[in-house]
Amino acid sequence: MSDVSGKVNLLNFDHKSMREYLESIGEKPFRADQIMKWIYHFGYSDFEQMTNINKKLREKLQRNCIISAPDISEKQVSEDGTIKYALKLEGGQEVETVWIPENDRATLCVSSQVGCALECTFCATAQQGFNRNLSMAEIIGQVWRVANDIGATRIAGTRPITNIVMMGMGEPLLNMKNLIPALDTMLNDLGYGLSKRRVTVSTSGVVPALDMLKAKIDCALAISIHAPNNKLRDELVPINKKYPLEDFIAAAGRYIEGSKANKQATIEYVMLDHVNDSTDQAHELAHALKGLPSKINLIPFNPYPGSPYSRSSNSRIDRFDKVLQSYGLTVITRRTRGEDIDAACGQLAGDVFDRTKRSVINAAKNAEISSLKNQPKADTISIKVV
């Protein structure tokens, strides 16, 4: 829970653990409620600004605690108003977060990991490989940092963050330990107070974790399918070899059963030209989804350097859409946002990968140089930078 300063980062606590921490240092648990309001409603990180907390406690917090979110290392604004943030983490790694304003809402796309281990062949993040899970502070800190940057605290009263989607870098369900308390803070009235239907977790098919999520928290669900059968999905989404499509769809059905956040699951389907976009495949997809209450988001593929795929033509997308609608399915073709700054779906990584890789290599070199200085002269040391 501590950062490099040795202080406890309060962004690593949800409401329950914040109360437990305050009790552990001899304070009344209601103080946690006050502190959370200052952090998330006002966007404060300075304990001296928390004026309804007595001076003695403020001084104790100042000595032992910190409110630390990832810093903005780069900010790019798209022609359509979308903003992509590169946020710097401890250790020099970076993740990307995207704020997408629309007429009646503003959605924040949040990352859960540095890189991703699932190796989906059409996704830029997957090409980066997996580095590590984000801490709770690094997940909720993305929301806190962007909210402060755009002035979207409750007190400011400006354009708020109305929706959060866990659709950034990484597979959220492979970081359950830190995802759950972060989601709780997004939903809790002492945190961001969003409704269950406005916080969405997207998964590519970690079936056991999806069942665990149901037992832990109720929020909106999006499932990334991208293929109508196991043969093609094995190629596009390799985790399908472990958890086949029919098991994934069944798990989604179990999740939305009894859910107050979901009347239906959102199906994410990236449109790859002449790969998964034929009318025959549309029929096959409709049959695969039979029995699952769902709406389908068709996502035009967003190209990135080195990708072997192309975006489906509008005519192929339209034909695919019409076939699905003929089965009575609700279908939406997602409008691509932030493409000019590589902030669109499937594009997150880019320069962040290059900077992260350089920072890791430099850190490794510095560590090896330091160890060399501390070794006896007679020793022979082999240095290998990965």
Swiss-Prot record:
Keywords: 4Fe-4S, Cytoplasm, Disulfide bond, Iron, Iron-sulfur, Metal-binding, Methyltransferase, rRNA processing, S-adenosyl-L-methionine, Transferase, tRNA processing. S-adenosyl-L-methionine binds at residues 170-171, 202, 224-226, 302. Binds 1 [4Fe-4S] cluster. The cluster is coordinated with 3 cysteines and an exchangeable S-adenosyl-L-methionine. Its cofactor is [4Fe-4S] cluster. The keyword Coiled coil does not apply. Pfam families: Radical_SAM (PF04055), RlmN_N (PF21016). The keyword Amino-acid biosynthesis does not apply. Disulfide bonds join 109-345. Reaction proceeds by a ping-pong mechanism involving intermediate methylation of a conserved cysteine residue. Specifically methylates position 2 of adenine 2503 in 23S rRNA and position 2 of adenine 37 in tRNAs. m2A2503 modification seems to play a crucial role in the proofreading step occurring at the peptidyl transferase center and thus would serve to optimize ribosomal fidelity. This is Dual-specificity RNA methyltransferase RlmN. It comes from Colwellia psychrerythraea (strain 34H / ATCC BAA-681).
